[in-house]
Amino acid sequence: MTIMRKNHPLLKLINHSFIDLPTPSNISSWWNFGSLLGICLIIQILTGLFLAMHYTSDTTTAFSSVAHICRDVNYGWLIRYLHANGASMFFICLFIHVGRGIYYGSYMLLKTWNIGIXLFLTTMPTAFVGYVLPWGQMSFWGATVITNLLSAIPYIGNTLVEWIWGGFSVDKATLTRFFAFHFILPFIITALVLVHLLFLHETGSTNPSGLNSNSDKIPFHPYYTIKDLLGVLLLLMVLMILVLFFPDILGDPDNYTPANPLNTPAHIKPEWYFLFAYAILRSIPNKLGGVLALILSILILAAFPLLNSSKQHGLVYRPITQFLYWIFIANLLILTWIGGQPVEYPFTLIGQISSILYFAIIVILMPLASMIENNILKLHD
């Protein structure tokens, strides 16, 4: 068997990625989230496939087909809630994975980091178009508001919006194409994941100490397969608690009302995992400015390698930057809270302060802290 897994063209690939892969001996549980994301992706593709077998992408029957899945299909309710809450688990793992990358300086593996940003940027529209499919009130109005943002693009904006809608409003054509996008994008994500892994295994993983670990590597199997298995079991436990006890806790009650173009919900908001970006968008009074800030809030991740002036790898031995990092995380949670609040005082003011702080920490304060730490520790070229 050993000879076969090392010589067979296909098994050799799996062997080099998951069995004999040299891995730093000291990576902590924060490194588990990559494999958890892989499990989440598999769960989403499988549950999504079974949902697609019973779903109809037509404005007159979409809402009813989702109700039919929950009421009449064998374990349809389970598949539907696994898919809906699986998306939330996906984004929780994604945020932790990116947060770990920032904390431990993984952004210095440029190719892996940039593919990761592309993965994040592909996952966001996938989740957005998926949220539109049940064709509830929040699905319809969320689609209307978010797609309308493209009209802020000078000259081609309005044409672009109508082109995406397939008409003069969000209607049957929009729903059909969103279903098509939602079906194809996870497979594009899977392809990007393979590229992400390919680049990661070119350089090897980082580790908590931030030092070169080439002299101290252990095989991935059995050490990290067992460790990842524990993570997977914990993830599945949390997911099943969500699905079986609190299936609607992360959703919006408005989405249990069929879409009605004549009745606008009191507060239009996206799913919870987009609220931080939505808060940044709303905090700028100008439409185009808001859209640019929204895009930059994600693309700013690409600036981390450029803005890094520290002579140390990661934040483990950098208390000033560590302090700023945790302020950044707290600020992100505040933005998430603000995104779900109505547009009124004091929420607008808190949102504006948090949005400024979000960019200021990354662009100004963290590089400044790095320079101060370099000086204190006399780390010069």
Swiss-Prot record:
Transmembrane segments: 33-53, 77-98, 113-133, 178-198, 226-246, 288-308, 320-340, 347-367
GO biological process: mitochondrial electron transport, ubiquinol to cytochrome c
Binding site for a ubiquinone: H201
Cellular compartments per GO CC: mitochondrial inner membrane; respiratory chain complex III
Family: Belongs to the cytochrome b family.
UniProt: heme b b566 binding residues: H97, H196
More details: Heme 1 (or BL or b562) is low-potential and absorbs at about 562 nm, and heme 2 (or BH or b566) is high-potential and absorbs at about 566 nm.
Reported function: Component of the ubiquinol-cytochrome c reductase complex (complex III or cytochrome b-c1 complex) that is part of the mitochondrial respiratory chain. The b-c1 complex mediates electron transfer from ubiquinol to cytochrome c. Contributes to the generation of a proton gradient across the mitochondrial membrane that is then used for ATP synthesis.
Binding site for heme b b562: H83, H182
Gene name of the encoded protein: MT-CYB
Subcellular location: Mitochondrion inner membrane
Membrane-related topology note: Multi-pass membrane protein
The record's free-text note on cofactor binding: Binds 2 heme b groups non-covalently.
Superkingdom to which the source organism belongs: Eukaryota
Subunit comment: The cytochrome bc1 complex contains 11 subunits: 3 respiratory subunits (MT-CYB, CYC1 and UQCRFS1), 2 core proteins (UQCRC1 and UQCRC2) and 6 low-molecular weight proteins (UQCRH/QCR6, UQCRB/QCR7, UQCRQ/QCR8, UQCR10/QCR9, UQCR11/QCR10 and a cleavage product of UQCRFS1). This cytochrome bc1 complex then forms a dimer.
PROSITE patterns in alphabetical order: CYTB_CTER (PS51003), CYTB_NTER (PS51002)
Cofactor(s) needed for function: heme b
This protein's name: Cytochrome b
GO molecular function terms listed in the Swiss-Prot or TrEMBL record: metal ion binding; ubiquinol-cytochrome-c reductase activity
InterPro entries found in the cross-reference section: Cyt_b/b6_C, Cyt_b/b6_C_sf, Cyt_b/b6_N, Cytb/b6-like_sf, Cytochrome_b, Cytochrome_b_C_euk/bac, Cytochrome_b_N_euk/bac, Di-haem_cyt_TM
Keywords of the record: Electron transport, Heme, Iron, Membrane, Metal-binding, Mitochondrion, Mitochondrion inner membrane, Respiratory chain, Transmembrane, Transmembrane helix, Transport, Ubiquinone
